[in-house]
């Protein structure tokens, strides 16, 4: 058990986003029902952009209304309902709009929703060491346009490495799951993408505005998409004898969120180039990546892919229109005039409308 202390800093200024003209997700009510203890079920749901400011809600369990008066000012409800029986809940907005429902099983676990996962098979490194897989980072997006989030899960092998360490790793995988555990696809990044916390940052968003989210991430020779198609040279192995990858092509790929199909692949910017330009000679600093989604024009989400922070830092923004993955801009601390930004990075970045012009800026470091 651990305790987490938080410093709460008041927000002094809000962004000036024009929500009426922003490309936003088209999500449903998002009702979630979780058994908190043997006697109570907690419900939460979304307050939608389309809801009036004075919207209120009624809650139904198995078709019978259970709240005495409409709920206003909150999207949370605690129901006295003992374990041992299944129940279906429905949240209905009083002033019109989308309803939503969720069910609780008779044997529902306490405090969480169980989603079955398909764990990848164990593997063996070139020198005989075995590895298995752990569920790692995850993101969410509505990949099929039904108004509900799916989960994009990254699988990390047990032999994954920090950039500072030598060693081979098993491949990184991405799975897409519906909330009932249905797996839609699996992407195998292949042996030419090293596994570890710094190597694979991925963005899930509806970049082209078709109502379905895409996945964008770095790929390489041998990456296999969710339909079985291989990117680049399937026979290439760019790993050196220390298990590092210091040569070979790098790509940026946008995947269809519903099928896992690679829809477009371009050369990765910022490229690796000379390792020494990033501050060392063994791909520690050159292979530290960050990524984010940002409304750079105030209307459409862009993917911002970043490389390096201890010495050189390069950020590249991309747009996907459903047909072409286009480079919007590149910021490089090695560009004359940008020298002050060198070495200012960190293990994170933030996105916000800092100057209140309705467009996002990137806070790096």
Predicted regions and their residues:
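Sec/Tat signal peptide C-region and signal peptidase I cleavage site
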Residues: 9-13
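Proline/serine/threonine-rich low-complexity linkers at boundaries of modular beta-sandwich domains
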Residues: 16-25
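Bacterial N-terminal signal peptides
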Residues: 1-8
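Short, solvent-exposed loop/linker segments at the N-terminal edge
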Residues: 33-37
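Beta-propeller-forming repeat regions
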Residues: 24-28, 38-40, 47-52, 64, ...
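Short beta-strand elements bearing conserved aromatic residues within extracellular beta-rich modules
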Residues: 56-59
